[in-house]
Swiss-Prot record:
PANTHER family in UniProt: ALPHA-TOCOPHEROL TRANSFER PROTEIN-LIKE (PTHR10174:SF130), ALPHA-TOCOPHEROL TRANSFER PROTEIN-RELATED (PTHR10174)
Gene: Ttpal
Function: May act as a protein that binds a hydrophobic ligand.
Domain CRAL-TRIO: 118-283
Keywords: Transport
Any Pfam family the entry gives: CRAL_TRIO
Protein name: Alpha-tocopherol transfer protein-like
Classification via InterPro entries: CRAL-TRIO_dom (IPR001251), CRAL-TRIO_dom_sf (IPR036865), CRAL/TRIO_N_dom (IPR011074), CRAL/TRIO_N_dom_sf (IPR036273)
Taxonomic source organism: Mus musculus (Mouse)
């Protein structure tokens, strides 16, 4: 059996306190049952500082911090939900709390994206083939989110609808504990992206999207692979680079039309034939069905009125470290120069 076959895995359908400060917690209650394999438990321990024997103690510590510091924050406090934030910040309580606050702050600060966020409201985007999740994970166990901007026709709906579809997909993926530990990989195909289409993704949109992905959502982005990027992508990347932290910027890989380069990172046996793979034609319908089957969950989470008292005592809820509006203006001018210089 080849090395690629051995690595093939099928995706599912879908600063801690010192150990001496608190006693060991009792066994996990029925409310939380760990679904991680032994290998993933080991990986979580080594990479995320997650210790099964302290897991519920850590969750309780974060829960207590939320209740004390943000008593009016309308958020789930169940074990499984809070674990997402602890894992995303390697069980550093303070950073996990900030991520949780940012998560809700981002949702409140961009109603065009987060209001009425449910699969049935995004059928046009889903049916366009703009995005899907490949049926197999990569050798590291990462889900592969495939995005194809050329499938978007701007006259049909605004770019924010695409962003809503991406966020919807991330919300579904992060429900899996496997994804919380392994993270995801993004494969973006920029074939056919024109100057007029690229101009819709300006610095103001980029600032918000990058802010959410880096500071406002509990997911680990392990790599971003760009293929078939036209000359215009030099301008697109100039838009987003100022907002990227060095760690994530170093995880961008531009392959052009060199599929052999892509295959050194994503093996052929997990890729559809459109990208030189052996996993059949790209299937978008299966992932669409997964999302549409989750309609009720999204209605409960994103389609309920916000409690009047949920204002976090008037504190701002925007991710820290984002570039100012003045800098956005500078980026817009630079972006226009970059875009036109590509032609």
């Amino acid at each position: 059996m080849s090395e690629e076959s051995d690595s093939l895995r099928t995706s599912p359908s879908v600063a801690s306190l010192s150990e001496n400060e608190l006693p060991l917690p009792p066994p996990d209650p029925p409310g939380y049952v760990c679904s991680l394999t032994e290998d993933l438990v080991t990986k979580a321990r080594e990479e995320l500082q997650e210790k099964p024997e302290w897991r519920l103690r850590d969750v309780q510590a974060l829960r207590d911090m939320v209740r004390k510091e943000y008593p009016y924050l309308s958020t789930s406090l169940d074990d499984a939900f809070l674990l997402r934030f602890l894992r995303a910040r390697k069980f550093d309580y303070d950073r996990a709390l900030q991520l949780l606050v940012n998560y809700h702050g981002c949702r409140r600060s961009w109603p065009e994206v987060f209001s009425n966020l449910r699969p049935s409201a995004l059928k046009d985007v889903l049916n366009s083939g703009f995005l899907t999740v490949l049926p197999h994970t990569d050798p590291r166990g990462c889900h592969v989110l495939c995005i194809r901007p050329d499938r978007w026709i701007p006259s049909n709906y605004p770019i924010t609808e695409n962003i809503r579809a991406v966020y919807l997909t991330l919300e579904k993926l992060i429900q899996s504990e496997e994804t919380q530990v392994n993270g995801i990989v993004i494969l973006a195909d920029y074939k056919g992206v024109s100057l007029s289409k690229a101009s819709h993704f300006g610095p103001f949109i980029a600032k918000k999207v990058i802010g959410i992905l880096q500071d406002g959502f509990p997911i680990r982005i392990k790599a971003v692979h760009i293929v078939n990027e036209p000359r215009i992508f030099k301008g697109i990347f100039a838009i987003i680079k100022p907002f990227l932290k060095e760690k994530i910027a170093n995880r961008f890989f531009l392959h052009g039309s060199d599929l052999n380069s892509l295959h050194t990172n994503l093996p052929r046996n997990i890729l559809p034939k459109e990208y030189g793979g052996t996993a059949g034609e790209l299937d978008t319908a299966s992932w669409n069905a997964v999302l549409l089957a989750s309609e009720e969950d999204f209605v409960k989470e994103f389609c309920q009125p916000m409690p009047a008292c949920d204002n976090l005592l008037g504190q701002p809820l925007l991710p820290e470290g984002l570039i100012s509006d003045a800098q956005c203006d500078d980026s817009m001018r630079a972006m226009k120069s970059q875009l036109y210089s590509c032609y």
